[in-house]
């Protein structure tokens, strides 16, 4: 099937590997403590704090614990390969197709990144998480204000646990950069900031441009569109 083929490289099927980034045990261990429960695991937080990587690290943890890679399916609406999943019906159809093609046995682990970009996503997530005839465990991420706790409790009928993901802490920053804990490294952390992708940039100008672009994205996608603000200059 062409849809399965198009998303294959983003999944662990057929011996594929995925980039898991820097280990963040503070979060992965928290998520892991709920493994085995059918409550929906929801990772929230602002854009680019590393939610996707924590999803992947959780999936790799499952594989290391003996779960078959065929029982794990990734869906990421930020990638064009998943453009065919526009609404809850598309999502439901894809999961059925995945089951027919991969034929997983036992519990199925579904990871959906940027779930808010799928219209009506909560209908499928609620249905699968409450289906006592099938064994699903669901993990989702969301970045914008549609994923605020107040709305989550309505969308998911209270059957979820939320993990709020933050940028790198000073301890994580020092560990990743292999820097000694102290005043000098702390000042560097304060200057650089904690966004994980900044680790790959050396130039201060590049870092500033990255943060400026991120700020504009948050304003446009999470504030202006959300609240239909007409006079953008007021921001």
Could you tell me what each predicted segment is?
Residues 1-15, 20, 167-235:
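Interdomain hinge/linker elements that couple catalytic modules in large macromolecular machines
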Residues 52:
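Walker A/P-loop
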Residues 73-106:
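Short glycine-rich substrate-engagement loop in P-loop NTPases that contacts/grips substrate
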Residues 122-140, 146, 153-154:
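Conserved catalytic/switch belt of AAA+ P-loop NTPases
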Residues 146-161, 177-178:
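Short regulatory helix/loop adjacent to the ATP-binding pocket of P-loop NTPases
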């Amino acid at each position: 099937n062409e849809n399965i083929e198009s998303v294959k490289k983003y999944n662990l099927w057929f011996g594929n590997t995925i980039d898991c980034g820097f280990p963040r045990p503070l979060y992965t261990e928290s998520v892991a403590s709920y493994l085995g429960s059918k409550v929906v695991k929801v990772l929230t937080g602002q854009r680019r704090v590393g939610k996707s990587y924590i999803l992947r690290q959780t999936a790799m943890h499952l594989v290391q614990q003996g779960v078959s890679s065929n029982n794990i399916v990734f869906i990421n609406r930020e990638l064009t390969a998943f453009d065919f999943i526009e609404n809850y019906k598309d999502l439901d159809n894809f999961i059925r197709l995945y089951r027919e093609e991969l034929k997983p046995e036992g519990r199925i682990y579904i990871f959906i990144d940027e779930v808010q970009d799928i219209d009506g996503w909560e209908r499928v997530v609620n249905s699968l998480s409450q289906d006592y005839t099938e064994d699903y465990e669901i993990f989702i991420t969301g970045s914008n204000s549609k994923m605020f706790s107040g709305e989550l409790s309505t969308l998911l009928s209270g059957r979820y646990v939320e993990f709020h993901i933050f940028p790198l802490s000073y301890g994580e920053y020092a560990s990743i950069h292999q820097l000694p804990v102290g005043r000098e490294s702390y000042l560097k952390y304060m200057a650089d900031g904690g966004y994980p992708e900044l680790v790959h940039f050396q130039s201060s100008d590049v870092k500033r441009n990255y943060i400026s672009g991120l700020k504009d994205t948050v304003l446009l996608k999470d504030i202006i569109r959300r609240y239909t603000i007409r006079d953008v200059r007021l921001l």
